[in-house]
């Protein structure tokens, strides 16, 4: 995160409605040993801007916002490209924002406030506020780097079928739902795992820490 301090003149407004989906990437040692620290790869967020004049005039916003594009006939939102933090924002007339390309959740928050600050500077007669920021879903990606091995998903399913759904003829991935966790994991024979359904990075890490040693027991030589 590049920015941690904000001047008192431009302190963040109160927060009230933002949702985010975060992608996490885990790096694993070559022998599929201990997982190194998780790294947030991409955040997709949605936020709501409250404005004293609603709906927002997108033509006006496009004319005053730098690095923005607006083609009403093709898409009903202004596209704003921020440099600091580096991300892309879609702003709709309803006040809804969709943010993509953020590196972490705090960057997503800063991007929301950056858009509002820019609008305040260029629309001095309007009251603007971002109104609750929370993570709604986290998507994690894990690659075990099995090299000359694969995961025996058929055996994994036979021995853990209470927690699994697996129909190889319809989809190559095994769906794993831990009994005591809301996290859902999609496991592929190649060693790639997609983790979703968590509300925090800690939940993702706990779920993966529980599954990781179990998965290693189902490695077999690649045929």
Can you name each region flagged by the protein language model?
Residues 1-184, 190-192, 198-223:
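Intrinsically disordered, low-complexity polar/charged tails and linkers
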């Amino acid at each position: 995160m590049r920015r941690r301090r904000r001047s008192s003149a431009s302190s963040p407004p109160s927060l009230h409605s933002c949702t985010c989906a975060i992608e996490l990437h885990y790096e694993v040692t070559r022998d599929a040993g201990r997982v190194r620290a998780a790294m947030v790869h991409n955040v997709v967020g949605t936020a709501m801007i409250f404005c004293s004049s609603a709906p927002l005039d997108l033509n006006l916003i496009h004319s005053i916002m730098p690095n923005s594009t607006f083609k009403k006939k093709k898409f009903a939102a202004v596209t704003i490209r921020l440099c600091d933090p580096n991300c892309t924002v879609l702003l709709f007339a309803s006040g809804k924002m969709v943010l993509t390309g953020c590196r972490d959740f705090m960057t997503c928050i800063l991007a929301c406030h950056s858009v509002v600050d820019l609008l305040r500077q260029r629309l001095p007669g309007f009251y603007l506020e971002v109104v609750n920021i929370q993570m709604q879903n986290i998507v994690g990606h894990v690659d075990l780097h099995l090299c000359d091995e694969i995961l025996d998903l058929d055996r994994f399913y036979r021995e853990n079928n209470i927690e699994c759904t697996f129909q190889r003829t319809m989809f190559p991935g095994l769906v794993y739902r831990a009994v005591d966790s809301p996290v859902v994991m999609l496991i592929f024979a190649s060693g790639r795992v997609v983790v979703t359904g968590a509300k925090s990075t800690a939940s993702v890490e706990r779920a993966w820490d529980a599954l990781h040693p179990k998965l290693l027991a189902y490695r077999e030589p690649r045929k």
